[in-house]
Structures are given as structure tokens and as C-alpha cells.
């Protein structure tokens, strides 16, 4: 039996998993959910890991291509409660927001500083372009990188105003879940796995304004593994909203923008859900588009 070396520990790789992506194998087979699934097409960087010293997108790496390579995930950085200097710097500089992309950010910085202990701001920017942060905490990330680089070189760092992030007086206390975010221990909804769980795939509207004429639920339900198709034909209308409950969970009657959810397909596996969602036939009647404020203000605008 072959093995993959993850965080200096060999993990058995079953033959049926050779074609599995490293991302799914880490998360589904071994519960290493610190590696996050963002776009799943190798673009956003949320799934970054270090392979033989270089940052790689685990969502597009097949397990069979990684035999004999050293792989580091966020779970392999800290030594017990002792954090890696990069993790410590992220804490000291208050980088974390939601924490979803934080593990990928940390690993990207670790690989950068191992290859280049004295990166310039331009080199930092170039290395960090591959990790998209939906919270936008890039300025603090830059400070954390500069601080970590200095510490790894045995130097003390202060910011451009001469402030030391390690000071006690006048400094902010870490958010309660900061360490869990920085180590990848914090779990998001998709990080939980349950016995007999089903997987869902959203189906999005293709048009900015259209009437929903029909959704072919029966044909989709006949596909392998499909358990349920949630749409206006199968589910009572449910309204949600932060102040007023005036927005349907899924489209009813018509769609009002490209990307509005028109259905959710549930199946036994993620692959079955994705395939069935791609085959779900939605029939639209196109309506006049309203693409500007001026158009929307016209009396009787659709």
C-alpha cells in the first residue's frame, strides 16, 4: 500500500483514492479540515498547502501525483500550543477576520519566508496574489509578514509608526477564537461530516430577469444517488431577511438577477449532486431587463 507524507506522518493511500484530489482526501478521509474548499477550481487559494517547499492548490492536485512528496497543512505548523512565528505574527497584528482563508494565508507566508527570508514589499505582493481574502485584511497581513520575517531573522520589529505589536499597554486583546482560526481548528459548516449525510449543489439562474416556467424535477430525481430537488415546485415558499422577511430562500415565480438560486440538488455524494445539478433542466421565459436606476424608477417598471 502506498502512503502520502502529511506533516511528517505517513497516511495510507487506498488505491480507490488515487484519482481523488488532495483537498477532498485530507478533509473527507482524515478530517484535516484546516485546508478549506473555496472555489474548487484552483483560483482562490483557500486550499493552499505546501508541497516540497512550494505553495500548491490542493483542490486540483490528484493524490497519485504526490507519492514521495512532503506535504504540509496548517495542522502541521504549531508544535502543541507553541505557534509558528508566522502564526504568532498574525495574532499580534490582528490579521484574522472570518478566518476562512487564514490557514492558506499562513502557509503561503511560511513558504515565502522559507524561500526568501528578506522579501521586499513587491515580492510579498507577488506571493500573496494567489490567496483571495473575502474580508480584505491585506494591510494587516503585510505587517504580519514583515514582523514574522524579522523574528525568523532574529530581529525585533516595529511598524512604520514605531509601534511594537507585542506591547501590553495600548494594545488590543486577541479575539476569543483567534488561535482556533490561526491553527485551522475552527470549523465552518462545510467542515462537519456526519454518518449518512447528503450533499447539496446549488443551481443558479442564467438570466437577469426571467419567469420560471418549469423545472424538470422528475428526470433529475431519477439520476443515481439523488435524494431531493428543492425548488418552487417541491418546497413551500420560505421568506428570510435581516430586518424584514421579504426574500425567498430560492427563486419563486421569477428570477431577478444572474446567479439567483433556483434549485438545490441533494445526493448521496458530492459528485452525484454536482452531476445532477448540471443536468437539471430549467425552462425560462425571458423578461425585460432593468439594468439601471433610471429604468427602475420609471412608473410600471418590471
Predicted regions and their residues:
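Flexible, low-hydrophobicity surface segments
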Residues: 150-302
